[in-house]
A protein has these predicted regions:
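A conserved acidic beta->alpha catalytic loop
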Residues: 22, 29, 37-46, 91
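Short aromatic/hydrophobic "clamp" motif used to bind/position activated sugar donors
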Residues: 84
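Acidic donor-binding/catalytic loop of UDP-sugar-dependent glycosyltransferases
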Residues: 43, 89-104, 181
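Glycine-rich, basic loop-to-helix element that forms the pyrophosphate-binding segment
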Residues: 63-79
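Conserved donor NDP-sugar-binding/catalytic core segment of glycosyltransferases
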Residues: 96-127, 201
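A recurrent flexible, glycine/aromatic-enriched loop bordering the glycosyltransferase active site
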Residues: 120-121, 137-156, 172, 178, ...
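Catalytic donor/gating beta->alpha subdomain of glycosyltransferases that bind UDP-sugars
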Residues: 168-228
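Short, well-formed alpha-helical segments that are part of the catalytic scaffolds
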Residues: 11-25
Length: 334
């Protein structure tokens, strides 16, 4: 079995060396690495060219302005081999990542897609709190600890990619979720390989987290996934609080503090639930959990604000144009 690993990049000069080094030192190195640059304005292409000049099995595609879905499609289309591995810049691969994926695929000729596991990088107090706030904890199925499917830790047959016409190309995020669902709905067989581990670096500050999740929010709606996130935030939480605030302002303005107190209590409860849900991933003392709660609460508030702002952006910028297309058609520029 020969494997081409496809990586979309843009402005990744800080992380691209680590990714390339980890790919080239795999216990089972890829036969080819295809990198699509989506319009970098930093030194990313020059760094990649250094590796090519030094004889690494790397190909660079300069795609101009390209979002991740288009980058993956261009890379997959020009890849030389039947099996396609996907990962991203900013991801740290375990040394046996590709070996584990390939072994799983070779063990059963009926397998079409192998997806590995992943872990958030929690090397600071903030990142640990961020993981508690928004990263779903692993679950156990039949004694095997699993994570949701993650395109940055995936190996699949080219045929599966071709059958669904590749990734949506006009989405900044969630294009991988649509792609995976379409492949599964087309009847291709998925298997999980827990030994294929990658490490996902989280945003390091509240502001960078907010900016990233505004993008996620807008594109989540464009992908047709509103009910999976924003609906709960807008209707279950803030819809009720808005009604309560309106009632107080109309009937008892002196109690305007009450909706604010209710919001803070709600944030406290949600933070407590998140900490409890992750107690096995991040065990801690009561005092440590209290400190985490003080950080998880503003993180949840920031995520809510991002969900709301992204929804407003979608309403103002995308709603009418997108309503004339299905999410998948819109994602492919149809």
């Amino acid at each position: 079995m020969k494997v081409s690993v496809v990586v979309p990049v843009r402005d990744e000069e800080r992380s691209i060396r680590e990714l390339l080094d980890s790919l080239l030192t795999q216990t089972r190195p890829p036969d080819e690495i295809v990198i699509t640059d989506g319009g970098s304005t930093d030194a990313t292409p020059q760094i990649i060219e250094e590796y090519i000049h030094n004889g690494a099995p790397v190909r660079l595609i300069r795609a101009g302005a390209a979002l991740p879905g288009r980058g993956r499609n261009l890379g997959a289309a020009q890849a030389s081999h039947e099996w396609l591995g996907f990962t991203d810049a900013g991801i740290r691969l375990e040394n046996n990542w590709l070996e584990a994926l390939v072994a799983k695929a070779e063990a059963d000729e009926n397998v079409d897609v192998v997806y590995g596991s992943w872990q958030p990088v929690t090397d600071t107090f903030f990142k640990q709190c961020a993981a508690i706030a928004y990263v779903p904890p692993p679950t156990s199925h039949g004694g095997i600890i699993t994570r949701p499917r993650f395109i940055a830790s995936t190996l699949l047959r080219r045929e599966a990619w071709q059958a669904v016409n590749g990734f949506p190309e006009e989405l900044r995020s969630a294009e991988d979720l649509i792609f995976m669902d379409r492949v599964e709905n087309a009847g291709y067989r998925f298997v999980f390989e827990p030994r294929a581990q990658v490490h996902w670096d989280l945003r390091p500050t509240l502001w960078s987290t907010f900016k990233r999740f505004v993008v996620y929010s807008r594109n989540n709606i464009r992908a047709g996934l509103f009910r999976q996130w924003q609906a709960t935030v807008l209707f279950k939480y803030y819809g009720v609080l808005a009604v309560l605030l309106a009632a107080v302002l109309i009937f008892k303005p002196s109690l305007v503090w009450f909706p604010i107190a209710a919001w803070l209590l709600l944030l406290t409860a949600r933070a407590a639930v998140a900490i409890r849900r992750n107690r096995f991933c991040y065990p801690a003392s009561l005092l440590q959990n209290l400190a985490r709660g003080a950080m998880v609460m503003p993180l949840i508030a920031v995520l809510d604000a991002a969900a709301i702002l992204g929804s407003i952006q979608w309403l103002l910028l995308d709603c009418f144009r997108w309503s004339r297309k299905t999410p998948v058609e819109a994602g492919n520029g149809a």
